[in-house]
Amino acid sequence: WGMHYVALNAPGIMPGNPMGYQWFDLYLNGVYISDVGPKEFEIVRSLINENVKKISNSISLISNDLNIEMSDCFVMGFSQGGIMAFELGQSLNKKLAGIAIISSRIISKEYVPNNSFLETPIFISHGAKDNVLPISNFDQSVEILKHHNYKFESHLLQNDEHTMSQETITLFQNFIKKNI
């Protein structure tokens, strides 16, 4: 394909999982992020925004070194990385080649879509047997994408848990081929 791949790790180690990384703490004051109040959500939002800037700077540096445009970049994120991928796309004033949200969700239910991002193709997938993020997160994310008229394809994978299966990889590869 003549492609370059770069994988960024989140800066924090997941509590209870020394092999896992996190962009932000899932539990603020002992409350899971889906259940936090507005004050705690603002803390999560500021952490997301801070890390989105770091990701954006990293991608800019790498794309400049490789002499490629942002419109030639696909950004994929798994779990919290999917949240970050969507938020990155939303924060840029540029169209990307594509965004992938895998076993993840769109964290904000209310926002004003960025017109450049509305033109970016989005791949979203989730495992029906995911025991980390409920399917309701996938359903809500798909509804947000539909409501704002994003260009997207969605895949609910019946045999998948909270993982990147071979089926997910194949579907994402096909998404890339369609959008390069």
Regions inferred by a protein language model and the residue ranges of each:
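Serine-hydrolase catalytic machinery in alpha/beta-hydrolase-like enzymes
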Residues: 1-68
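A conserved short beta-strand
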Residues: 94-106
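Short beta-strand/loop motif that positions the catalytic acidic residue
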Residues: 123-126, 130
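C-terminal catalytic histidine-bearing segment of alpha/beta-hydrolase fold enzymes
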Residues: 136-180
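Active-site signature of alpha/beta-hydrolase-fold catalytic machinery across serine-
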Residues: 87-91
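Short beta-strand immediately N-terminal to the catalytic nucleophile in serine-hydrolase-like folds
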Residues: 75-77, 102, 125
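Short, proline-enriched alpha-helix->beta-strand connector loops that line the catalytic pocket
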Residues: 70, 117-122, 148-151
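Gly/Ala-rich beta-loop-alpha elbow adjacent to hydrolase catalytic centers
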Residues: 76-81, 85
